[in-house]
Each structure stands twice: as structure tokens, then as C-alpha cells.
Amino acid sequence: MKVRASVKKVCRHCKVVRRKGVVRVICKDARHKQRQG
């Protein structure tokens, strides 16, 4: 899980999702997981 000021899609499988006011990137590649912090 990377914590970043700006989250971006890395590949075509990435999805930007908003959960409880936190912007996240979920992907089938676990290395692409990100959270906005």
C-alpha cells in the first residue's frame, strides 16, 4: 500500500474508489494499491 498525496491509475486494471472519504486505488496487481494521505 502506497500512501500518496495524488493517487493515479497505474494500469488498465486499476480503479479509483472512494471509501469513507478516503480515495483509494484498487487493482488486481497488489503493487498498485494506493491510498490518499
Swiss-Prot record:
GO terms for cellular component: cytoplasm; ribonucleoprotein complex; ribosome. GO terms for biological process: translation. Pfam families: Ribosomal_L36. SUPFAM superfamilies: Ribosomal protein L36. GO terms for molecular function: structural constituent of ribosome. Keywords: Ribonucleoprotein, Ribosomal protein. PROSITE patterns: RIBOSOMAL_L36 (PS00828). Belongs to the bacterial ribosomal protein bL36 family. NCBIfam families: rpmJ_bact (TIGR01022). This is Large ribosomal subunit protein bL36.
